[in-house]
Amino acid sequence: STKKDKFSFKDHFYMELAHRMASRAIGTTGSNPPVGCIIVKKNNIISRGWTQPTGKPHAEIHAIRQVKDKALLNGAEIYCSLEPCSHFGKTDPCVDSIIKSGIKKVFIGDIDKNPIVNGKGIARLEKSKIKVKILFNKEIKELNKIFFNSKIEKRPLILSKIASTLDSKIATSNSESKWITNSLSRSHGCLLYTSDAADDWSS
């Protein structure tokens, strides 16, 4: 698969759904990246999944296990926000579950830059005659920015939160501290703090 692959509207739609599933896992995955996936059979979504808390199933396994009639997986397509892992850790490799399931086509939103993966998952799938297409997604790349930085640069991504009033004050005249940011910016700050890399580097 290359960047020259052509994708339909539905391909982009399903990948965006996978991105939304990945967003559900933010702040709960420890040192793992937040990943989401959608399983499709004959243009019908038959399952969805996202990375479970550390030590529990990854997104792909989570989705596959939720399909009660496993025969539906034969010939199905799976849209993964990130390249499926191919190594043993606290869980089995996701590519093994995909290969055994009978899924015949895998769409990937980004390549996992973690050196222990980085294309190995794709290679395993293609070796098993499973078609792989890389549908690069900017939102997914942004979602995994902190994770990639921790694995490639071996250091946390430094983020700073700075706020002041229009007259450059950070407290009232009687020194009482007040919120000077709105609820949206506070929620975004909490989201960044609880991201997987923040958990990984806080110990």
Describe these PLM feature segments:
Residues 193-203:
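Single conserved hydrophobic/aromatic residue that forms the stacking wall/gate
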